[in-house]
Amino acid sequence: MSILKEFREFAVKGNVVDMAVGVIIGGAFGKIVSSLVSDVVMPPIGWLIGGVDFKDLAIEIAPAKEGAEAVMLKYGAFIQNVFLLGVIAIAADGMGTLINKIKKPAEAAPAEPTAEEKLLTEIRDLLKK
């Protein structure tokens, strides 16, 4: 079997197409969540703690020299990315829970015992006496 034929069979199964769609949607979702955190969530938090823009929070480790910028420890961007991770984790957990609820089949009612099972139960009950 040729490599091309094997790949075609693998791709046609649907898993590759589903995965590609998931990656594309995930990339777009990541941009939306990033914008939500940086443009909607962080500004009010910064305002509440004194008008701070988290993107600008940094500590200068080494001053600027000729031809080189200052070395900065940008902890504000890190805090913002931690919030971003939290929002993505909550959204992914919510979507996973929703998908599992949709996929989970309704529990079937217990099946009625067969005639053989009923007979065996009666025999067991008689032997107990």
Curated annotation (Swiss-Prot):
Topology in the membrane? Multi-pass membrane protein
Q: Where in the cell is it found?
A: Cell inner membrane
UniProt cross-references to Gene3D superfamilies, sorted A to Z: Large-conductance mechanosensitive channel, MscL, domain 1
Q: Which GO terms describe its molecular function?
A: mechanosensitive monoatomic ion channel activity
Top-level taxon of the source organism: Bacteria
Q: Which GO terms describe its cellular component?
A: plasma membrane
Q: Which family does it belong to?
A: Belongs to the MscL family.
How does the record describe its quaternary structure? Homopentamer.
Q: Tell me what this protein is called.
A: Large-conductance mechanosensitive channel
Source taxonomy:
Bacteria, Pseudomonadati, Pseudomonadota, Gammaproteobacteria, Pasteurellales
Provide the gene name from the record.
mscL
